[in-house]
């Protein structure tokens, strides 16, 4: 089997990273950082299967449009998660898509006194956990999800975002 045909190992998720046209690369982490953050989230959730997802980093206008269209909320938010919807019986490594709004992530990091890179790590881990089916609507679910976030971020040397 050639390298191009090989399925990525669970420890090496396939991450497709894109940035909105015209969005400055300043402050937006590189692809290897996103892969490490995805890998940490998958490890914390004990997902061992191969995984593939897309991450799109957007500006305020695009972030607002996504949130308005899919959540009926007229503002840009930090991260949106779109789990893959596969037909019954189809098993692919595709987890789904994450949308990260760069200006919102940057503003929140500044307001919360966090390093920008650490906040990107947190939002990526948070989004991946949503793709895996975790949520934070009910308190017990939120506690479980936050515990997994802390575990993943600790592996990355990122301080507890909830402390």
Question: Where are the regions a protein language model picked out?
Answer:
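An acidic/histidine-cluster motif and surrounding catalytic segment
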Residues: 1-120, 131-163
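Extended, folded domain segments that form the structural surfaces/walls around functional sites
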Residues: 123
């Amino acid at each position: 089997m050639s390298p191009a045909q090989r399925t990525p190992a669970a420890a090496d998720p396939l991450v497709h990273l894109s940035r909105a046209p015209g969005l400055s690369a300043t402050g937006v982490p590189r692809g290897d950082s996103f892969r490490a953050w995805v890998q940490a989230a998958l490890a914390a959730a004990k997902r061992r299967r191969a995984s593939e997802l897309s991450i799109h980093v957007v500006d305020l206008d695009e972030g607002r449009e996504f949130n308005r269209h899919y959540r009926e909320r007229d503002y840009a938010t930090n991260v949106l998660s779109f789990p893959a919807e596969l037909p019954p019986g189809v098993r692919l490594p595709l987890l789904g898509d994450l949308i990260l709004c760069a200006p919102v992530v940057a503003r929140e990091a500044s307001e919360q006194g966090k390093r920008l890179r650490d906040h990107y790590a947190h939002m990526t881990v948070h989004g991946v956990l949503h793709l895996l089916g975790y949520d934070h609507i009910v308190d017990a679910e939120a506690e479980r999800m936050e515990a997994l976030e802390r575990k993943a971020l600790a592996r990355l040397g990122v301080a507890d975002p909830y402390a």
